Amino acid sequence: MLLRYLKSYIYNSVAELRDTSFFDEEDIRNSEYNIKRNWYYNNENMPDLYGKKATITDETWFTTFRLYPALTKFFYGRSENLSLTGSYRDRMKFRLSETYLLLCEARLGLNDISGAREAINVVRRRAHAPEITDSEMTMDFLLDERIRELVGEESRRFTLCRTGKLLERTRKYNTESGPVMRDYHTLWPIPQSIIDSNTGAEFPQNEGY
């Protein structure tokens, strides 16, 4: 999957995103204009490499420092500051496409499969992705579609908790956290300071902590 790890989009010393066949071939959200995978040497002090494409393989991508791939929705690539690890580009807070995806989720909750399919296909048509049928319309497909549409934007944990899929999908797709995920991890521990400050009644800790 494009999101190999669900780590709240916190950068560390290795790339967190990996490209696979997660998108349909026609889907423009997977284009080089949206997800940059091709990088070229631009250091004039390296004449043997200058202008040539950097080679990133399946064996080396994971150790490529904050590079592969990059989401251009957040990335300026301004030549005056090549060391810039972020950008000042505005972040989307509300998007029409997510409204349709939320409508799809609501209709799934009502078991209105055709209505859910109609809602998600509005987003897929705009992305030039093939429309899906009722038989393909599942909560898992919707969660995958949210990755394709909102990668880097949504608070994924909240989405997975809301849909009751946190444990299942973390254990299935997250090779780092999945093996140690426990049922009680759907909730976080309540800070002890909050518990202590509640003097009017007993304030129990969440189970497992």
What are the roles of these predicted feature ranges?
Residues 41, 47, 108, 166, ...:
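Amphipathic alpha-helical interaction segments
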